[in-house]
Amino acid sequence: MNPIRKKRLYWILALLCGVSIAMALALSALQENINLFYTPSQIVAGEAPQGTRIRAGGMVENGSLMRTQDSLALRFSVTDGAHNITVRYQGILPDLFREGQGIVAMGKLDRNGSLIADEVLAKHDENYMPPEVIHALKQAGVLDNPKRVKQESTR
């Protein structure tokens, strides 16, 4: 084989190896960061995977918030109007967190169907609700006037 062709072949092979490694790393990073959204009805039906990080959203049930006296541990129920799930969280809740308001909690399901949350997100203002929560509440027939609720603008 001609030395120039051999050198060119080595460069092409090195380039292909580099691109392959970069693609593998990118796909691995994306796979770890995908958090699918599930409603309480989907979680109760068993559609959400256990042990995988998911997002669950709905309305915080009135009277369901229970705090422990000696730690930051708390639990509350989230509903979509049809079903509810228990969310357990250790930490400080967002300032806008209230019973009867929309939230999205991120975490993993335990064997009992409770969400062990490591992050809780509350709505932005008195009219904002995450788009996934609006869709879930519309399907459950709970949301009475969806036009008064602002959705996050997509930019």
From Swiss-Prot:
Pfam families: CcmE. It comes from the Bacteria. It is found in: Cell inner membrane. Residues 30-155 are periplasmic. Residues 1-8 are cytoplasmic. The keyword Phosphoprotein does not apply. The chain crosses the membrane at residues 9-29. InterPro entries: CcmE (IPR004329), CcmE-like_sf (IPR036127), NA-bd_OB-fold (IPR012340). It is a single-pass type II membrane protein. Keywords: Cell inner membrane, Cell membrane, Cytochrome c-type biogenesis, Heme, Iron, Membrane, Metal-binding, Signal-anchor, Transmembrane, Transmembrane helix. Heme binds at residues 124, 128. One of its GO terms (molecular function) is metal ion binding. Belongs to the CcmE/CycJ family. This is Cytochrome c-type biogenesis protein CcmE. It comes from Janthinobacterium sp. (strain Marseille).
